[in-house]
A protein has these predicted regions:
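Non-heme Fe(II) oxygenase catalytic core, chiefly the N-lobe of the double-stranded beta-helix
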Residues: 1-241, 246-282
């Protein structure tokens, strides 16, 4: 197995490995590499649905079905991320997966089924690196702050529609996922790194701040995730796999390919109770 870092902060390519048949020592090497590099990239991995699920289960129990994303008919734990002719992707946002639920996921495994010849890259950002580069004064202030995470970003998206009563399905299902309050800084449960745990898509506001002050401060912090020194960018090919640590990163899907067909399958691993948020009760 050969592991080649992309840069000093985030990302590594893994070669000479078959994800279908990892020995125990190989999996442990990969796991430690994931903690170190935060996102791992693989080429030419012909995973079946069963093999994809089995790989995910080696990292932990899988998340139940996503409330909005489509999934495979024969296994609802495999999410389909797809663009088809006449159905281009929605607007993309920087995000950490599913921070709107009480316990955010541990990691995700994305497998490319077919992709455009050009475009459709994904970019990841090292949010531990962003936090580490804040000034001591900024860190001191942010440690005391909490933010609200919510499902609002799905409203009016391609995943939203009206039910038979004319009600938004996102708003309706959001009742099962009320807003969550989280510390702005969270400690990674395995590495001990401090992480700026906010994201553009699901972090709505800072608790006890005015709307204007909250958005101004969040926007300034979000802008740091757009700085290339914290990023790694991956170009997909058929059979490519990316595994990322959801507790230390956020990511962005580049939607520069119009409605060219693109399909990826994702399994997501449940997170640790130590990172559980609390219901927000205004």
């Amino acid at each position: 197995m050969k592991i080649t870092p992309v840069n000093e902060k985030i990302g590594a390519f893994v070669e000479d490995v078959n994800l279908n048949s990892l020995a125990i020592h190989e999996f442990e090497t990969l796991y430690q590499a994931l903690l170190r590099h935060k996102v791992l990239f693989f080429r030419d991995q012909p995973l079946s649905t069963e093999e994809h699920i089995a790989l995910g289960q080696r990292f932990g129990a899988l998340e139940p079905p996503h409330p909005f994303f489509p999934h495979l008919t024969d296994n609802d734990q495999v999410v389909i991320i797809e663009t088809a002719r006449g159905n281009p992707p929605s607007k993309s946002y920087w995000h950490t997966d599913m921070t709107w639920q009480v316990v955010p996921p541990k990691c995700s495994i994305l497998h490319a089924q077919f992709v455009p010849e050009q475009g459709g890259d994904t970019i990841w950002c090292d949010m531990a690196g962003v936090w580490a580069d804040l000034s001591a004064a900024e860190q001191s202030e942010l440690r005391s702050l909490e933010t609200i995470h919510a499902l609002h970003a799905f409203e009016d998206s391609r995943y939203d529609h009206l039910d038979a009563n004319g009600e938004s399905i996102v708003i309706k299902r959001s009742r099962d996922y009320p807003p969550i309050r989280r510390p702005m800084m969270q400690v990674h449960p395995e590495t001990g790194q401090e992480v700026l745990f906010i994201n553009e898509q699901f972090t709505r506001s800072i608790i006890n701040w005015s709307e204007s002050a909250s958005q101004l401060r969040l926007s300034a912090l979000f802008s740091k995730a757009r700085q290339v020194q914290y990023q790694v960018r991956f170009s997909w090919q058929k059979g490519s796999v990316a595994i990322w640590d959801n507790r230390a990163t956020q990511h962005f899907a580049v939607t520069d390919y119009g409605d060219t067909p693109r399909r990826l399958h994702r399994v997501t691993v449940q997170g640790e109770p130590s990172l559980a948020g609390k219901p927000y009760l205004p």
